[in-house]
């Protein structure tokens, strides 16, 4: 279990948002404490359509580590489940700075870079906002809800289907 608030994000702030990227040293320490090392291959899953596990995989990959999502997440796992907590010994995970090329900021969004809003369409349109203090979206952003990347059973669409979906972008 990799906690969002302790490992995958820094504390919320008005300037950086609800789940800002974690400090790279704190991220490395959190993973090392969980027994995830520099050379480990991580397969992540969640029960949220891949949103949380996807964040872990993205963070690991932009740091050059080997990581993948379990397609379909927990709901497609066909084996038995357990309630036992697996503990791994502390590992070595060297802190690495976040690569600038993998990140955008407000100035990037304001200067015409393509911005995709992956939230639900009703949140994008400002019709419903159950989480954030303001409804709506970044001016100029396009709505491509992450749920559109998945089939009815929660698995990712084929690469061809995803290419077609994003061809208009």
Residue ranges and their predicted role:
Residues 16-110, 127, 168-169:
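Thiolate-centered catalytic microenvironments shared by cysteine-dependent enzyme domains
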Residues 1-36, 105-168:
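Positively charged, proline/Ser/Thr-rich regional signature most characteristic
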């Amino acid at each position: 279990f990799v906690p969002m608030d302790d490992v995958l994000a820094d504390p919320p702030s008005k300037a950086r948002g609800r789940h800002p990227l974690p400090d790279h040293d704190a991220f490395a320490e959190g993973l090392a404490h969980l027994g995830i090392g520099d050379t480990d291959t991580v397969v992540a899953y969640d029960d949220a359509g891949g949103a949380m596990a996807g964040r872990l995989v993205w963070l690991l990959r932009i740091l050059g580590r080997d990581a993948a999502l379990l397609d379909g997440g927990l709901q497609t796992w066909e084996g038995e489940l357990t309630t036992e907590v697996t503990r791994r010994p502390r590992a070595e995970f060297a802190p690495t700075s976040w690569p600038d090329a993998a990140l955008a900021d407000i100035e990037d969004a304001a200067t015409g870079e393509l911005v995709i809003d992956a939230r639900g369409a009703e949140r994008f349109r400002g019709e419903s906002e159950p989480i954030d203090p303001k409804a709506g979206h970044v001016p100029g952003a396009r709505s491509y809800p992450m749920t559109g990347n998945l089939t009815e059973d929660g698995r990712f669409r084929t690469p061809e289907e995803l290419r077609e979906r994003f061809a208009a972008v």
